[in-house]
């Protein structure tokens, strides 16, 4: 398990660093960076399919699409939802929105807990229920003080919740399905990449090609590390360690000069408290499982 924790932390560190790394790719726009990230990351996704023995599952899904072409629409929809989130992740640090996106990632687990209860009738623990209430109070305070959440935070919460909910409802939660979602994004990614005027870009950033290849390497390595960790760790612990990435995103936001305005303090404090409660819940459940396993061995 210790190795799994280290691999998960590596994935979170790489994803968090990528948030900062996008600021080194100027003068490329968020759309340009997104296109090249998808192109350079896709080979790593294919490698992951081979490494984690998902080729049979991928072939089976392709055969299903061949027999029932309308199934391709589900992968296209999920691909678009996921792709927009990836674009926003790379766009935000260069456009003064990294804190808003970080707030969205802080709120996301709480929204997913609520969605799980409403749409999938999942049970909510006491800790998570309190976390949902506190996060809701934070959102209400932001609506009263600022008129609402930022559009970036709303897109993160609703977009990712819709993405994961659709995948769960259609039972398309494996790596093979993710590969097809990435494949659906290749045409638009290539189009975005071809629109880049590299002659102009290289005058400002002569090392841009090397930096883009490095972006793909960071993104691909992070993806593979996360998949490895997901196979080595319980889901509760994996989700708990995922908060490391969110914390790093907040640190990056402060590092590049963004500041929390006074009207956002109540929301920030409520989200941090909610995050801590979700983490406590994860630790508690994981500890209970370990104790139960020890009793079984006796």
Swiss-Prot record:
Coiled coil (UniProt feature): none
Entry-linked Pfam families: EamA
Lipid bilayer topology: Multi-pass membrane protein
Swiss-Prot/TrEMBL keywords: Cell membrane, Membrane, Transmembrane, Transmembrane helix, Transport
UniProt subcellular location: Cell membrane
Protein name: Uncharacterized transporter HI_0680
Similarity section: Belongs to the EamA transporter family.
Entry keyword Cell membrane: yes
This protein's GO CC annotations: plasma membrane
Predominant place of localization: membrane
Superkingdom: Bacteria
InterPro entries, per the entry: EamA_dom, RarD
